[in-house]
């Protein structure tokens, strides 16, 4: 049995949710209604996020990148946590509902590209189009966009020990099939609503300390 860690990006690896930051800075007011429909599950994540990015003109590409480079902060302890999982031969994947044009640059030099799974974007038209290369498999009908539970099934064996780290509604389906969940913010609410056991965290020092205990138990 091997330990596999599947970690969200926006609001988990970064302190802020980069998609929401982009919308607040660059999207028109109607983005707020779409965001609320995603959080209430009135819109699927795939449909809602597609609608949000269709509100953003593609000629803002460079401005958005510059804005995120200046404002996005990596959560405390993340660099040390990555070193810890490497030293302990723990598989680590970023599974992000975020977009390639900001996830890759913000993780450059920290996580190899082949360990990052995120959505793709097309800037060839007037507004941003999202592409979904990691959509739901036959076991999921939730129109997740990037389907985290499907990726877990694809990347691991059923007898592996699955750890999910996340913060929001987009991590719920993955949390349902995890052996251990580290949760913060809105994911805590969703875990409690769905009776999913979780360990709360605010920094990756919290996660590392708990994972160290887990390794000692399993040794």
From Swiss-Prot:
What Gene Ontology molecular function terms does this protein carry?
Answer: 2-hydroxy-3-keto-5-methylthiopentenyl-1-phosphate phosphatase activity
Instruction: Please provide the Gene Ontology terms (biological process) for this protein.
Output: L-methionine salvage from methylthioadenosine
State if Transport is listed as a keyword. Answer: no
Q: Which InterPro entries match?
A: HAD-like_hydrolase_phosphatase, HAD-like_sf, HAD-SF_hydro_IB_MtnX, HAD_hydro_PyrdxlP_Pase-like, HAD_sf
As recorded in UniProt, its EC number(s) are: 3.1.3.87
Q: Which CDD domains match?
A: HAD_Pase (cd07524)
Q: What is its EC class?
A: hydrolase
Q: Which domain of life is it from?
A: Bacteria
Where does the signal peptide begin and end?
none
Give the reaction(s) catalysed. 2-hydroxy-5-methylsulfanyl-3-oxopent-1-enyl phosphate + H2O = 1,2-dihydroxy-5-(methylsulfanyl)pent-1-en-3-one + phosphate
Keywords, alphabetical: Amino-acid biosynthesis, Hydrolase, Methionine biosynthesis
Matching entries from Pfam families are given as: HAD (PF12710)
Q: Which HAMAP family match?
A: Salvage_MtnX
Q: NCBIfam families under this entry?
A: DKMTPPase-SF, HAD-SF-IB, PRK09552.1, salvage_mtnX
Family annotation (PANTHER family): PHOSPHORIC MONOESTER HYDROLASE, UPF0655 PROTEIN YCR015C
The protein's role, per its UniProt record: Dephosphorylates 2-hydroxy-3-keto-5-methylthiopentenyl-1-phosphate (HK-MTPenyl-1-P) yielding 1,2-dihydroxy-3-keto-5-methylthiopentene (DHK-MTPene).
User: What is this protein's record name?
Assistant: 2-hydroxy-3-keto-5-methylthiopentenyl-1-phosphate phosphatase
Which organism's genome codes for this protein? Bacillus cereus (strain B4264)
